[in-house]
Amino acid sequence: MLDRIKACFTESIQTQIAAAEALPDAISRAAMTLVQSLLNGNKILCCGNGTSAANAQHFAASMINRFETERPSLPAIALNADNVVLTAITNDRLHDEVYAKQVRALGHAGDVLLAISTRGNSRDIVKAVEAAVTRDMTIVALTGYDGGELAGLLGQQDVEIRIPSHRSARIQEMHMLTVNCLCDLIDSTLFPHQDE
């Protein structure tokens, strides 16, 4: 059992090292995309399923409340957080549309959709991205594996942060770290003197 525990830590560390080599440019571009949208008076919609939903909610909470230092609230909405909306849509057997309907209702040109999907193939996330494209939104996608169907939907203005792993647990861990990096970069760019 102890060896298995050590193996989990070792694999996680190795994934972090690989991500630290491969992802800084994509994370930087994603952060600047989010910052520019906020500076233009727009908002960030975010969504995910399971652990990815938790990461989406963590991002939205860190924008609305704060990340590590006090600062003004920033507009972000986790589309997976409203159980009444979610169950109303799924009750009509529109599972694949659970986020797309919200994107069409709430998204505007200049907004950003932060779409989090471990494999990039979740139908409801793919449909949300398709809806965001029709609304002239920019997409920041956090993926893993080969990026899945989601990666193929992204345009030149969009950013994919693909974790270099084929293990869901490692990808989800790195998605959380990436979300924290994005929050830190947004805060340090928009409020450079808040932590002094």
Swiss-Prot record:
Residues 34-196 form the SIS domain. Pfam families: SIS_2. The keyword Metal-binding does not apply. GO terms for molecular function: carbohydrate derivative binding. One of its GO terms (biological process) is DNA replication. Keywords: DNA replication. InterPro entries: DiaA, GmhA/DiaA, SIS_dom, SIS_dom_sf, SIS_GmhA/DiaA_subfam. The keyword Magnesium does not apply. Belongs to the SIS family. DiaA subfamily. Required for the timely initiation of chromosomal replication via direct interactions with the DnaA initiator protein. Homotetramer; dimer of dimers. This is DnaA initiator-associating protein DiaA. The gene is diaA.
